[in-house]
């Protein structure tokens, strides 16, 4: 597939030690060579790096001192010729280098266009392309490992095997329909068809079993910290984040809005949401914060309910416990450095079997136990299994769920005695749906939409 030559700054904008301008296309080397003073880049071997200068052809002025990497097709990320110009990391100089390249007839790349070309040129499939962004956005080592496994094609291989199983079954059905008179063709009975379709459904279900943990690793656990004012919610946020993100005072109602922060807890990304203290108030601004707190609580995957060890439970505390019933929650009894006034038996009753952690945040006690409880609640020690291929992308999960339903419809049709040639429709649809994950049967509009979410230069 032939494309024009594109270029973009591939490193984050801002001051830094190094910035990289990436150029990809059939004539990428020739275009860069025009403005490069040093070795003749058109004559150098592939996968080599060369020192020189970028020169403004109009003024013959040296613009930058650079190192230029030459990578020739097809052994490149895009399977096109790629040139990467390593500049100093100043905003002015790197933008000037980019402008000089564009002046040679090179087009500014769209967001994600380098990865899109890698997909369109067959270097990677669609699930691997999506994993590139997952790797960039990974917030923990475990999330990074999930993305790398997907980039290496683990999910693609699983999907490929399933599609091959369906394809072989479809071919067997076709032969039975078109050549029923041939004695050397194995008859595709309803029992054989059910066995093959059931195997595919079981494999899809097995992959989907990892989706909850995979999605958490990719997107994080939305965790709301709730409680009455001044029970230690902001102190808990600061302790988990290990820096002062929220203002902590003895004045009730200090936190008036929702504060969000990502934190790595035992390899699990937590999207921590410190909410305004929930209480009845006449303060208009605080009341808005309280309403937002209730909204965040309802949307959270996990709720940390904070109560005060040195105060008796109030009606507001008990209302909070009732509000979180049916959700995953952990109770934090804070301020254990102060004399006890809380009824712990009542706390145990309200917790209804959920974990209770006692903390003294001012003395930094109880945080390790809380972090362990959070990790155990969602992963139960299974997350470290190197053999598990996690499915974490919402698009993939939706397609797998859809494929599972379609193959289920096929099984139901077979069991009801529907003719085999009619069952073929559901089998074909399942094969197509699974192909959308890897991009084998995907619409061009979806491809454009997916790659538009990438950052510029990737």
From Swiss-Prot:
GTP binds at residues 230-235, 249-255, 274-277. Residues 220-379 form the TrmE-type G domain. Mg(2+) binds at residues 234, 255. InterPro entries: G_TrmE (IPR031168), GTP-bd (IPR006073), GTP-bd_TrmE_N (IPR018948), GTPase_MnmE (IPR004520), MnmE_dom2 (IPR027368), MnmE_helical (IPR025867), P-loop_NTPase (IPR027417), Small_GTP-bd (IPR005225). CDD domains: trmE, TrmE_N. It is found in: Cytoplasm. SUPFAM superfamilies: P-loop containing nucleoside triphosphate hydrolases (SSF52540), TrmE connector domain (SSF116878). It comes from the Bacteria. Its EC number is 3.6.-.-. It holds the Pfam family TrmE_N. (6S)-5-formyl-5,6,7,8-tetrahydrofolate binds at residues 22, 84, 123, 458. One of its GO terms (cellular component) is cytosol. GO terms for biological process: tRNA methylation; tRNA wobble uridine modification. K(+) binds at residues 230, 249, 251, 254. Binds 1 potassium ion per subunit. Its main location: cytoplasm. GO terms for molecular function: GTP binding; GTPase activity; metal ion binding. Its cofactor is K(+). Keywords: Cytoplasm, GTP-binding, Hydrolase, Magnesium, Metal-binding, Nucleotide-binding, Potassium, tRNA processing. Homodimer. Heterotetramer of two MnmE and two MnmG subunits. Exhibits a very high intrinsic GTPase hydrolysis rate. Involved in the addition of a carboxymethylaminomethyl (cmnm) group at the wobble position (U34) of certain tRNAs, forming tRNA-cmnm(5)s(2)U34. Belongs to the TRAFAC class TrmE-Era-EngA-EngB-Septin-like GTPase superfamily. TrmE GTPase family. This is tRNA modification GTPase MnmE. It comes from Bacillus cereus (strain ATCC 10987 / NRS 248). The lineage of its organism: Bacteria, Bacillati, Bacillota, Bacilli, Bacillales. The gene is mnmE.
